[in-house]
């Protein structure tokens, strides 16, 4: 009996060693690459001078967007974002509104993680790195330079 118990313990340890390292909460979804801007003026200049199809997307919740947003921005709130499912409503809405050759300029709150996640998701579902761009310091810093 002791030998059987030791066998199961060793088997459990082996399984955890083999599979346990790839199941952390931080890598539940592999995000695609994106372009990050940390300077508001650079983000603004790049957006306004971009010659191809483009979209400015505010990822903040609807109430914050309605209280104030950048001129020309569309609201696709990240709070409905489902990190586990490629067919999440957010992704469907994005793909329905913008062809994958559209350059997406994302901004949100100073909580950079959610904006990073949606830009990474956009990159992965077909927009690619060059068409997935984010401003990482939030709406308040960006509105000071937006004309």
What feature does the model see in each segment?
Residues 1-21:
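Sec-dependent bacterial lipoprotein signal peptides
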Residues 5, 55-58, 104:
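Generic, low-specificity signal for short hydrophobic/alpha-helical stretches with a mild N-terminal bias
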Residues 13, 21-67:
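Flexible, polar/low-complexity N-terminal or interdomain linker segments that lie immediately upstream
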Residues 23-39, 66-147:
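Rhodanese-like catalytic fold shared by cysteine-dependent sulfurtransferases
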């Amino acid at each position: 009996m002791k030998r059987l118990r030791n066998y199961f313990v060793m088997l459990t340890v082996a399984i955890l060693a083999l599979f346990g390292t790839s199941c952390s909460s931080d890598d539940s979804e592999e995000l695609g690459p994106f372009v990050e801007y940390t300077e508001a003026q650079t983000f603004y200049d790049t957006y306004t001078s971009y010659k191809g199809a483009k979209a400015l997307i505010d990822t903040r919740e609807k109430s914050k967007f309605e209280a104030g947003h950048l001129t020309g921005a569309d609201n696709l709130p990240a709070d409905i974002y489902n990190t586990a499912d490629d067919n999440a409503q957010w992704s469907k809405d994005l793909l329905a509104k913008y062809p994958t050759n559209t350059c997406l300029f994302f901004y949100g709150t100073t909580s950079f993680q959610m904006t990073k996640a949606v830009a990474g998701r956009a990159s992965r579902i077909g927009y690619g790195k060059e068409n997935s761009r984010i401003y990482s310091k939030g709406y308040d810093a960006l509105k000071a330079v937006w004309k």
